[in-house]
């Protein structure tokens, strides 16, 4: 059986933590930031942990991640 392929789009957008959770960048920061509140910009600065249903889908895209 051939090796499974990792989806390139997923490996560029998501990182796995040491405990197996999926980390992703916050959404909604590409354009239109002038109308966003300062609080939104500040809280969307870092990354976030995906919810369990979303993480399950992303993990299926990256079969060889930790």
Swiss-Prot record:
Q: Which Gene Ontology molecular-function terms are recorded?
A: structural constituent of ribosome
Matches recorded under PROSITE patterns? RIBOSOMAL_L35
Basic residues composition-biased segments: 1-15
| InterPro entries the record matches | Ribosomal_bL35 (IPR001706), Ribosomal_bL35-like (IPR021137), Ribosomal_bL35_CS (IPR018265), Ribosomal_bL35_sf (IPR037229)
Q: What's the superkingdom here?
A: Bacteria
Q: Which GO terms describe its cellular component?
A: cytosolic large ribosomal subunit
User: Among the record's GO biological process terms, what is one?
Assistant: translation
Q: Which Pfam families match?
A: Ribosomal_L35p
Where do the coiled-coil regions begin and end?
none
Where is region (Disordered) located?
1-32
Keyword set, alphabetical order? Ribonucleoprotein, Ribosomal protein
- NCBIfam families tied to this protein: rpmI_bact
Question: Which family does the similarity line name?
Answer: Belongs to the bacterial ribosomal protein bL35 family.
Q: What is the protein's name according to its record?
A: Large ribosomal subunit protein bL35
Q: Which organism is it from?
A: Dinoroseobacter shibae (strain DSM 16493 / NCIMB 14021 / DFL 12)
């Amino acid at each position: 059986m051939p090796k499974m392929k990792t989806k390139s789009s997923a490996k560029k957008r998501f990182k796995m933590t040491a405990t197996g959770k999926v980390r992703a960048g916050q959404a909604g920061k590409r354009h239109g930031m002038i109308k966003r509140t300062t609080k939104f910009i500040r809280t969307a600065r870092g990354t976030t942990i995906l919810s369990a249903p979303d993480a399950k889908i992303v993990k299926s895209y990256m079969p060889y991640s930790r």
